[in-house]
Amino acid sequence: MKTINKITIAILTLSAAASVNAATTLKMGMQASVGSVEYNSAKMLADTLEEMSQGEIKLALYPSAQLGDDRAMLQQLTLGDLDITYAEFGRMGLWIPRAEAVMLPYVAKDFDHLRRMFESDFGQGVRDEMLQKFNWRALDTWYNGTRETTSNRPLNSIEDFKGLKLRVPNAKQNLNYAKLSGASPTPMSFSEVYLALQTNAVDGQENPLPTIKTMKFYEVQKNLAMTHHIVNDQMVIISESTWQKLSDTDKDIIQKAVQKVGDAHTQTVKTQEAELVSFFKSEGINVTYPDLEPFREAMQPLYKEFDSNIGQPIVSKLAAM
């Protein structure tokens, strides 16, 4: 009997030890598809976490909106049903209106400028509100490309935008960019854009350069204007419910891994953009560099309206950072 009890105790002890030492598996959902830069960086994050934790932290990836769109996944983070996802800093404007300022056309000059906003008192205030109200902890933000404009006619200046039927997503900042630049904003589903460009149902569209290449818009549009109108980022957000369950050691590993992979991701996107301009030129695309100052001037009514709605002069402060 004593022997059986000893064996039972030994088994229970081993089971407890195995439970304590079991790997932590986190779930990360995203809208990006397999093969995209975002997915590849998430895969790199999974590999980096496993390496840095010696196999104790694993990251399971759910790409291609398997878990819903970005709003659905953020809601899952709030409830603690999902651990990690991507979201743009300016996207927080849906819940925290002042955050939208960073995505207004021509407010962010480049990613370094956007990062200064993210790390400023303004950005910290937004992140604090994300945490306190929605259970979202922003670990870092990564560069995800700058939006440029393709068209079926050369765009050498803002004057060339007049009457241009420009496909944009159904988002305020993109609609405002088109309208205030003199174009005719034409919202439509992303999946319909290629055919619409091919048949001249629309005259142009706007997206980051990697998207223009991936979707092969350059096959049906022979003009690319470097309008630099909106800088895209993607925050890596973890559910605070998940964060509080982690040990201090695991938190440190995750934070360092996110920053390490973020640096690589940002550099990859910047390198891609530089190489893609040359690629498009080699494909016979006419690349133009219109003066951006008239575009910024055209956005002034939007900035004034935004500040008025928020009740404070946010835009000018962010633009000056």
From Swiss-Prot:
Q: Which UniProt keywords apply?
A: Periplasm, Signal, Sugar transport, Transport
Spans through the membrane: none
Location of the protein in the cell: Periplasm
Kindly indicate where the leader peptide sits in this chain: 1-22
Tagged with keyword DNA damage? no
Annotated GO biological process: transmembrane transport
GO cellular component terms? outer membrane-bounded periplasmic space
Which InterPro entries does this chain map to?
DctP_fam (IPR018389), TRAP_DctP (IPR004682), TRAP_DctP_sf (IPR038404)
Q: Which Pfam families match?
A: DctP
Q: What does this protein do?
A: Part of the tripartite ATP-independent periplasmic (TRAP) transport system SiaPQM that catalyzes unidirectional Na(+)-dependent sialic acid uptake. Binds the common sialic acid N-acetylneuraminic acid (Neu5Ac) with a high affinity.
Q: Which PANTHER family match?
A: PTHR33376, SIALIC ACID-BINDING PERIPLASMIC PROTEIN SIAP (PTHR33376:SF4)
Query: Which family, according to the similarity comment?
Result: Belongs to the bacterial solute-binding protein 7 family.
**Assembly and partners?**
The complex comprises the extracytoplasmic solute receptor protein SiaP, and the two transmembrane proteins SiaQ and SiaM.
Q: Mind telling me what this protein is named?
A: Sialic acid-binding periplasmic protein SiaP
Native source species: Vibrio cholerae serotype O1 (strain ATCC 39315 / El Tor Inaba N16961)
- In the UniProt record, the gene name given for this protein reads siaP
